[in-house]
């Protein structure tokens, strides 16, 4: 979680904290990997950073689950991409320091990020799917 938080927030200290934790527990991980699955996942994400998709948009009229952004989330979940993490930006919050542009007033918008760099916003689900088809594993 620290790796993803660091990449989403643009705060290297979170990534550095994850690196320290993995190094600190390295010998224990080798002895008993089953007991350290979360740290193994962090080590993997440090070595092979996943792409992160941030989906933003207002909720649907009267129902937070029926907006365009919710439809995009469902569409993105249909594809198997273990090297891509998808997050829904809550309400009208700013999408974070790494992305350029504001959440849309209507419809949906998404950003694809890796490490601490985000591509320009995508305002079309088909274009987002096409861009994700070109994203390689970390």
Task: State each model region's role.
Residues 1-138:
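Glycan-recognition and catalytic cores of secretory/periplasmic carbohydrate-active enzymes
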């Amino acid at each position: 979680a620290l790796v993803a938080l660091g990449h989403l927030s643009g705060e290297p200290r979170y990534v550095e904290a994850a690196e320290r934790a993995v190094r600190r527990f390295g010998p224990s991980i080798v002895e008993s990997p089953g007991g350290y699955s979360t740290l193994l996942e962090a080590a993997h994400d440090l070595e092979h950073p996943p792409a992160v998709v941030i989906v933003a948009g207002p909720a649907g009229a009267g129902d937070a689950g029926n907006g365009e952004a919710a439809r995009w989330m469902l569409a993105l979940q249909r594809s198997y991409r273990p090297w891509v993490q998808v997050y829904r930006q809550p309400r009208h919050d700013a999408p974070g320091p790494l992305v350029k542009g504001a959440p849309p007033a209507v419809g949906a918008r998404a950003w694809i990020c890796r490490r601490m760099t985000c591509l320009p916003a995508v305002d079309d689900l088909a274009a987002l799917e096409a861009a994700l088809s070109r994203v390689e594993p970390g």
